[in-house]
Every structure is written in structure tokens, then in C-alpha cells.
């Protein structure tokens, strides 16, 4: 087994691509499966970017069929595939090391990235099937995944280019709608996400930046920014925004809520 980036701690060795310390089998919701995928994705991105020299050396073409695994704890590992048939979870691309010396390094890394993206999707929807996700849960899971840049886009630099083209004027807090600071009433979770009408004399640049803010805001439950003209509500604890329909809050009900806490924050407090 070839370890990389502390990967052995993530899966427990021996081609344990499904391991990750047993974390996948504790998941039950689309959001939990997404967190599992996000951790695996982060580990694989490390292998192909910050840890690329180590990854390159581990992928010796003289060795047997090797795979790149990503684990939920954001580590990675280059190792042999799982021995059990069928495997515990879908396996990543086999033999990534064989093409290393026959290709330009950037092209080879991009090829591994494409296969890694494919593997992440197969693992995510394997868990979706295992946990009996219905159509709505599968849709939420796909939308959350689709809102992330692919590994291929990160490795090739396409993700940075897209981000610059999409939000040239946005700040680091652009995922929060500017309507949140308009008034105390709106900051207490009653603001719709639709962009406020510009006052007379307001600059065009300001309006464009505000529009970018709205476009980048994702619902904390379904992971999409669909329905910008619908009612949205903000958690006063974690400051995440949610579709009212996703958290079962109506505008009328919100009028009587002094301080709104989302389901995640409510559950955390109950467990504590």
C-alpha cells in the first residue's frame, strides 16, 4: 500500500476506499452524504495540487494497478484496489499510474481529475441508493454537488477563471444577501432574497455588485439559489440563508419569530 498525505488515517489501509473511519455508514441525509463527498473531494484536490510531487512519485508505472482514493477526513491515498468482490463501495479508476510517463504531466493530472470526479459522483449516489433517497433528496444532493467546482476545474485552473468572470466585484462575504442589513426587521429573517429596487440616483456599479451577492447565495438545506423571488429566511445563529419552504417557515409565521434558528442549530443545541 502506498500512503499519501496522511491518507492511511482516512480509510484504514489495504485499498480501503470505502473506509474513511466508517463515516459513510453514519450518513442518512443528502446533506450528510454531501459532507462525505466534500471531504473526499478536498483530499483528492490536495493530491493533485499541493501534494502533487508526492502523488507523482507514488504513481510509479512499474508498480501494479494503483488507484487514488479520497477520504471523508480530507486525506488521500494511492494504493491497490479493494480485494473483496464486489467492493464495499464503487472503486476509483484503476491503473492511473500506467499512463504517467506516456503523457504530459498536466494532461495526466487532468485525466486523473476527470476520473476522480466520476468516482465521487458514483460514491455519492451509491450512498443515495443505499439510504433510500427519494427524488427530492437526490435532487438536493446533485444540486449541492453541482454548485462545487469539479476537481478537473480546480486542477486545470478553470474554476478560478469562472469565479473571476462571474463575480468580478464581489467581496469575501458575497454569499450573504445585502438585503440582510437593510433593517432590523429584515435582519431578523423576514427579508426576501429578491434584489431591492434601486433608489433614484444610486450607482449602476452598486446595483451590479448587489446582484452578484444575491446570485451567490445558496440555501443551507437544498444547496441551490433557485427561487430568488420566493421567501427566504436567515438563521440568526449561523447566518445561513434558507428557502422558507425548505425549513417550513412562511412569511406570516416569520413575522412572529423574534430570533430564528435553523434546524441544524436547533438540533446542535438539543444534543448539547
Curated annotation (Swiss-Prot):
Zinc finger (PHD-type) boundaries: 216-268
Record keywords, A-Z: Chromatin regulator, Metal-binding, Nucleus, Transcription, Transcription regulation, Zinc, Zinc-finger
Superkingdom, natural source: Eukaryota
PROSITE patterns cross-referenced by the UniProt entry: ZF_PHD_1 (PS01359), ZF_PHD_2 (PS50016)
Region (Disordered): 1-24, 162-218
Swiss-Prot/TrEMBL site (Histone H3K4me3 binding) positions: 232, 236, 241
Similarity field: Belongs to the Alfin family.
Entry note about domains: The PHD-type zinc finger mediates the binding to H3K4me3.
Protein name: PHD finger protein ALFIN-LIKE 6
